[in-house]
Amino acid sequence: MAVTLPRPAYAGMFGPTTGDKVRLADTELFIEIERDFTLYGEEVKFGGGKVIRDGMGQGQASKAEGAADTIITNAVIIDHWGIVKADVGLRDGRIIGIGKAGNPDVQPGIDLIIGPGTEIIAGEGRILTAGGFDSHIHFICPQQIEEALASGMTTMLGGGTGPATGTFATTCTPGPWHIARMIEASDGFAMNLGFAGKGNASRSEGLVEQIEAGACALKLHEDWGTTPAAIDCCLSVADDHDIQVMIHTDTLNESGFVEDTIRAFKGRTIHAFHTEGAGGGHAPDIMKVAGLPNVLPSSTNPTRPFTVNTLDEHLDMLMVCHHLDPSIAEDLAFAESRIRKETIAAEDILHDLGALSMMSSDSQAMGRIGEVITRTWQTADKMKRQRGPLPEDKSNNDNFRVRRYIAKYTINPAITHGVSRHIGSIEPGKLADLVLWTPAFFGVKPDLVIKGGMIAYAMMGDPNASIPTPQPVHGRPMFGSFGGARTGTSLTFTSKTALAHGLAQKLKISRKLVPVENTRGNLRKTSLILNGAMPHIEIDPETYVVKADGMVLTCEPARSLPMAQRYFLF
């Protein structure tokens, strides 16, 4: 006999469905479920007296006959392509489908088969997102990786060799020997990793050898001398080997101004770090490059969003990170030239317009590794409060804005760095790097972080308790973070050139090396999803006032933020 459930009762049992709305943490962002893949009355749920039992929601199919390894049931998916409710199937560490799970022997419309060998993760009332990608990493200490994983990041790309002076300031792993050792160290972590070589050179030989050694990108940094000659040389080498170039431009304008740097690009594709400029770059107008078709711009999280405390914390941060001495007037002037409230305020709005395309951390080098996701949603919330709904959000929800902002730390860095075939979104065929959230803690503290199909990090109670939930409940590494599981569920990104030179055979590594691809000529800002706007940006050199297509971009600093102290009492 059919039974009609009231919406609250249905949501309590199976999670929200089409037309229901969910608040994200304590923000003013509300999503609405656009589609539910289930068949009402055929929902699957695990537990005593529930559906997923032998002969009911669980069939007899073996893995060889098509059963999934894992099914995440009834999850609300937030991704760049939409906001839906569905079951998600995982197999051999990858996503095999998004749809309706169950037993096709007795249920109609089954896309994903539950068999005796299928594990279940309950997604009812929870939100599922793709694992985050932080593309601005200073590999200063290995402990960063657990911190990133705990926040919901599953891919880290950058450079460094540990707490060396060069690494404190620049995201470079310089030279073949260092690159090889860092790739070998990757086996010890449940995290996709990629390493950038040093790109500052005026001759190509020193750059090519780093690519052959395994660098998946090259980084141009002003502390090593980002001159027009170095920019031109680095981009030429990158074009030859299909890798991305990241740039931190010349704050002091010693070797040229922003216009000279743009000329050195010669229209070639480049990833511009901390494009606002507080993290470094031509003062005061580096942000002009965010309007160019060949520049893929990102932010780092200390300036995200603009608050009453942003300016004060930046000066000391900058002095430490760039090996400056506050007693030297020139060093102090260098630091102060980079910190401008006008451009930081404009950065908020350019993100909301989709003109700044990515978020990242700048880990321990003017950025916080564990706060990329939180700062992204704080920025989105601040813009909702100050600017109101986006024009695209006409249905009394924030779906478009939410899709725009999630793309900034998932699919867009994956596209930029040539790995979107493997990661960056919840789509069939991609690595099962997934994060499950309780809506009240969305963007702050994940329930589960799934790495390559295996739970690698989770909120967990007292291990000596009789049940999993007694206090203290906090994030802890799970089995996916140990032993050989780490190498079987994570990737190291490198170059096609390195693999052609036998890198896998040369190094003592167990995990798979995957080449980056499609990072050059055909990759333009319009390739970046929901974040490809290219306004004409002007910055007054005297007042620092920012205009986009003639409109002054300014907003007030926030005095308080969501996703902050109420979530971090201990």
Curated annotation (Swiss-Prot):
What PTMs does it carry? Carboxylation allows a single lysine to coordinate two nickel ions.
Q: Where does substrate bind?
A: 221
Residues forming the catalytic site = 322 (proton donor)
Summarize where Ni(2+) 2 binds, as residue positions. Answer: 219, 248, 274
The EC number(s) given in the record are 3.5.1.5
Write out the entry's keywords from A to Z: Cytoplasm, Hydrolase, Metal-binding, Nickel
Give the record's GO CC terms. cytoplasm
Q: Where is the Urease domain?
A: 131-570
Q: Where in the cell is it found?
A: Cytoplasm
Q: Which residues carry this modification: N6-carboxylysine?
A: 219
Task: Describe cofactor binding as the record notes it.
Answer: Binds 2 nickel ions per subunit.
The coenzyme or cofactor needed here is: Ni cation
Any keyword Metal-binding?
yes
Residues at which Ni(2+) 1 binds = 136, 138, 219, 362
Q: Does the keyword Cytoplasm apply?
A: yes
**Which residues constitute the signal peptide according to the record?**
none
According to its UniProt record, where is this protein mainly located?
cytoplasm
Which chain regions cross the lipid bilayer?
none
- Quaternary form? Heterotrimer of UreA (gamma), UreB (beta) and UreC (alpha) subunits. Three heterotrimers associate to form the active enzyme.
Quote the HAMAP family the UniProt record gives.
Urease_alpha
Family, similarity comment: Belongs to the metallo-dependent hydrolases superfamily. Urease alpha subunit family.
Q: Which NCBIfam families match?
A: PRK13206.1 (NF009685), PRK13207.1 (NF009686), urease_alph (TIGR01792)
Question: What is the protein name given in its UniProt record?
Answer: Urease subunit alpha
> To which species is this protein native?
Beijerinckia indica subsp. indica (strain ATCC 9039 / DSM 1715 / NCIMB 8712)
Q: Which gene encodes it?
A: ureC
